[in-house]
Every structure is written in C-alpha cells, then in structure tokens.
Swiss-Prot record:
Entry note: cofactor: Binds 1 pyruvoyl group covalently per subunit.
Pathway as given in its UniProt record: Cofactor biosynthesis; (R)-pantothenate biosynthesis; beta-alanine from L-aspartate: step 1/1
Organism, as annotated: Chlorobaculum tepidum (strain ATCC 49652 / DSM 12025 / NBRC 103806 / TLS)
Catalytic reactions of this protein: L-aspartate + H(+) = beta-alanine + CO2
Residues that bind substrate: 57, 73-75
GO biological process, one term: alanine biosynthetic process
GO molecular function term, any single one: aspartate 1-decarboxylase activity
Pfam families linked: Asp_decarbox
Assembly information from the UniProt record: Heterooctamer of four alpha and four beta subunits.
Name of the protein described by the UniProt record: Aspartate 1-decarboxylase
Length: 128
C-alpha cells in the first residue's frame, strides 16, 4: 500500500496575475520552485486562503527572480490577484519511507520573497 504524503509547499504566496486565455496551469518563479523542490509540469494542489477554494493544476516554470505566481486558464477563476494561496505537491511512498519523510516548506512574504525554508522537523533557514 502506498501513502500520499506532502512533498513540498510554498506557503502564503500572493497571486500576482491571471490569464484566462491560457490553456491552464500555474506559473511560479523558478527560484521558488527550486527552493521548494518543485518542477515544471508537476501536479499541484492549490488552496486559496481568501475563499477556501481548492483546485489542482500543474506547474509552468516562471522567470527566476520575478516572484510571479500567475494562474492560467480555468484556474484564474479560482483566485484573484492579491489573494493568498498555498501551493502543495505530494508524493506516493511506502509506509516505512513515509514514517521518516520530512516535506520541504518555503514561506514567502507578501511580495513572494522567500523568508524561511525548512524541512518539517528541522531548523528553519531564514532567508531575509
């Protein structure tokens, strides 16, 4: 039996824009992706802290350093620019591996600048 475990999370990200005409997805700054151990085309669960809505989509790699979090296509109807969201990835693991797994958490400020990065249960790495 495999368990679905939190792999990584970008916490308190602010939606910077939306593009209803795009086919779908979420564009995320490449630096944030690297920090959170996320990659292009990876499936994500997004939670909108402003309205409680949850939706799934996939990642498009954004330009490093722009701090963009852009919702595309139908996902752009789920959160507005300025909304605070949580972006999560998950991984399947055997129970033995899952018991010792520590997801990567990246916490950002209101401008999507990384503030802290850590694995759950480890010391925070303060970034600014």
């Amino acid at each position: 039996m495999k368990l679905h475990m939190l792999k990584s999370k970008i916490h308190n990200a602010i939606v910077t824009s939306g593009d209803l005409e795009y086919e779908g997805s979420i564009t995320i700054d490449k630096e944030l992706l690297d920090m959170a151990d996320m990659i292009a085309n990876e499936k994500v669960l997004v939670v909108n802290n402003n309205n409680g809505e949850r939706f799934e989509t996939y990642i498009i790699e954004g330009t490093r350093g722009l701090r963009e979090i852009q919702l595309n296509g139908a996902a752009a109807r789920c959160a507005l620019p300025g909304d605070e969201i949580i972006i999560m990835t998950f991984a399947e693991m055997e129970p033995e591996e899952a018991r010792n797994w520590k997801p990567m958490i990246v916490i950002v400020d209101r401008m999507n600048n990384p503030k802290r990065r850590h694995r759950v249960g480890s010391e925070d790495e303060y970034l600014g």
